[in-house]
Each structure stands twice: as structure tokens, then as C-alpha cells.
Amino acid sequence: MFRNIESLALKKIDIELRFNNKYLSQENPLFVNDFVFELDNGKIVSKISDASVCFNINSIVAKGDNNFIENKKSTQAFRKLMSYYEVDNNIVEEIIDQVIDWIDYDSNPRAYGLEDYYYSGPLNNPKEYTGKRLFISINELKGIPAIRKIDWNIIDDHFCANQQNDNFSFNINSIELKDAYLLSSLFPNIDISDAEYIITYMPEEGVQTLTELSKLFPSRDFNSPNGMISFSSSSFLLSSKITFENYISESFSNIY
């Protein structure tokens, strides 16, 4: 049944984005209308939500000719986000370099990085090797030594591991007040109070272009972003809840 629901969700997403994949607001039927399936003595309720509003850890790298390299815009956004939690600058650089070394194909450590010699050596338990791939889950970050030096809630609250490794980006039309740090990190000249103001007064129908956003907030500086400004999404979360007599079960699926 859940497999059928996923297929229906994919079809619904395809239909909604087929003719306009550049604009997606929270008023879109994709997010408003739930799936409801009546069962004997129970039912299944499924909901699609926007999963783009997070810092994709994989955006820290960009694909070079033969290897992954640092995405300097994304790392600037990362530094700004970490500064709000007063994370020591050296630790921030360790995280950046160790994340890149874990993903890239070579065995040459960056200035603050670590390669297989560390992960397979006596100081690391369990013994393992760098992934030489993008992260699949943020839980994999628990294996990065520098990550263990900061509060895990920072990662849990703001980060994701989407398989696209494009520039740092999220759907501005889906941001909530709790996402003010992310919005501020995207724009070098937008501070927290600016970000909170923008989120508070963003129209429910959202915006479709940067020009429209700038006209709504003319005193805010949206120039030189640390990533890509997006008004739509390609990352979704399908949440399903099945109720059967006294039994309740939940299922979550990421859709890219």
C-alpha cells in the first residue's frame, strides 16, 4: 500500500511541476490536499511537504573534472551559519575540510582534513574508510571527528543530505521563522533581524522572482548570495500515517 502511495505522490508532484517548476508556494494543492485512503477498520493519511528548507551538507562540494572540490559559496554560507552558534573558527574549518575529504576521491588531506589513514587507524573506532561519495544521511556526519566537537542539535535542526550537490539553495516560499538562520546564511548582507522580518511579512502566496522579492523588501540587500535563490523545490517528504483499529504506524519517504 505504501508503495502505491509513493507512486501516487510522484505522479502528483510531476503534474503540479510539469508546467511551472520555477514557482511553488505553500498554497499549492500539492501541500494542501492530503491523500486519504479508507480501510476496513482504519485509514491511511499521507501528506507531501517541502523538504528543501535545510542546509544540504553535500552542497559543500562541487563536481570538478575528476574529483569533488570545495564549493566556496556554500562554505561561506556554512561559516555564517556556524557563527550564529559561536562555533570556534578552527572547528568550522576542520568540519569543512573533513567533510570534503570524506567525499572526495583522493587520499590527500586538506589543511584541517582527514583521510583513510585516520579513519582506518588506531585512533578511530570503528575502523572504516572515507566514503568517496556524497552523504546519504546526516547521521553519517557523526563519524566526522570535528562534527563531534559541536552540539549535534545544530546539525539535526538545520542540515540534510540530499543527493544533489548543487549550490546551497532552498525554496524561499517554504521558509518559516525557525529558518531565519538559514535565510541569513544565504545572503551576506542579511542579518538575523532582517531574515526574521522577511519571513514574517512574506506573502502566503510566496514570490516568483528575485525582482518581486526585492520590491517587497526594498531596504534589504539580496546581492551576491552564497548560493542559488530558488522559488520552487525538487526535494519532498512524503509522510504517511496508518490507523488500523488500535494500531498506529508512520512511514516517511524522501522524494527527489
Regions found by a protein language model. Name each.
Residues M1-Y256:
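Compositionally biased linear targeting/interaction segments
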